[in-house]
Amino acid sequence: MSVIKVLEIMSYSDKNWEDAAAKAVAEAGKTVKNIRSIYIQDHSAVVHENKLTEFRINAKISFEVSPNHAE
């Protein structure tokens, strides 16, 4: 049986929401192994002089927990 944990992460990009999601996964991947999915819960943008300047997401990243083999 697999156990899945979920992290809630906020990320941003000056390019687009897809890049913000990729950054969230890359950053989480530095300390979390076995990432299985990302769910974009919410997204927003910062507007400056009538232009979108920052793309923000709130995401949930799920990962499989490795069983502890220590006995």
Regions found by a protein language model. Give the residues of each.
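Extreme N-terminus of proteins, especially the signal/transit-peptide cleavage junction
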Residues: 1-3, 69-70
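Short, well-ordered alpha-helical segments
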Residues: 2-36
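A structural signal for short, well-ordered beta-strand segments
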Residues: 9-11, 43, 57-63
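Short beta-strands and strand-coil junctions in structured, solvent-facing domains, enriched
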Residues: 16-17, 47, 68
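Short, conserved loop-to-beta-strand elements that form functional interface hotspots
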Residues: 38-47
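C-terminal structural segments of small proteins and small subunits
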Residues: 50-71
